[in-house]
Amino acid sequence: MKGLLTAGGHGTRLRPITYTKNKHLIPIANRPMLTYAMGYMADAGIKEIGIIVNAGDDEIEKSCGSGKELGVKLTYIPQGAPLGLAHVVKIAEPFIGDDKFLFYLGDNILVGGVMKFVDEFEASGSNCHLVLSKVSDPERFGVPEISGDRIISVEEKPSNPKSDFAVTGIYLYDSSIFEAVNSIKPSARGELEISEAHQYLLDSGKSVSFSEITGWWKDTGKPSDLLEANRLVLDNLRGKNSAKVDNKSSVTGR
């Protein structure tokens, strides 16, 4: 299995921070945001990762290099313009080939990594596996309609959501996704929408399974999200102290 990671776009909602730094390199708990996703993939046994970057911008490559320090091999894939997530998948086909792959939006942070989702995708036998999270405002996201252990429809930012689940920025596919992204048409905003690709799979008789995130998940698209992501990550860090304390003393606190 390979990995595909987004690190392009312009981060307009995070200005003025992103005037001088790619949003995927903004530190969360003193680590570039993008390195969390790489670490999740490496922990799940995914060692070959393609990173979508803005054409002509080498900031991500200068920061992440070959990936050797994280135990992965990075391939940089330029995208000329932000034409939608399905377009990201489309231009990555030469890198992915016939392999299954994990597609991860680089500005997403979650607790627990992705190994559970990889295992559940492999066990499901499905063509596509979406990772969902319950939210209070599903109309802001792609929203699935669920029947049993399968998804039967997906709608992007619906006015009347059919569930209280959001499709997060974590997706798993086999090679059938490439037929979908090469067949759909641009939306009204001129982008190839990933929800349309998922619906194409469903309409073509492909199976779409899902996992639910049981801990926290954060899309760090806004300044308030960055603050919350820092708080969540720091709250889950556990320090280590190898000092010895004699048996007549006691230590309290974290």
Across the structure, where does each feature detected by a protein language model lie?
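Conserved core of the sugar-phosphate nucleotidyltransferase
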Residues: 110-188
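Left-handed beta-helix
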Residues: 1, 150-153, 175-254
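Conserved beta-strand termini and adjacent loop/short-helix elements that scaffold enzyme active sites
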Residues: 77-79, 131, 211-213
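Short alpha-helical oligomerization interface
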Residues: 19-24
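A structural signal for short hydrophobic beta-strand segments in well-ordered beta-sheet cores
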Residues: 25, 144-146, 210
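A short acidic, often aromatic-flanked loop/helix-cap motif at beta-alpha or helix-coil junctions
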Residues: 82-85, 137-138, 160, 217-218
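Active-site glycine-centered loops adjacent to acidic/histidine catalytic or metal-binding residues
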Residues: 9, 107, 134, 222
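Conserved N-terminal catalytic core of the sugar/cofactor nucleotidyltransferase
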Residues: 2-5, 13-16, 27, 31-105, ...
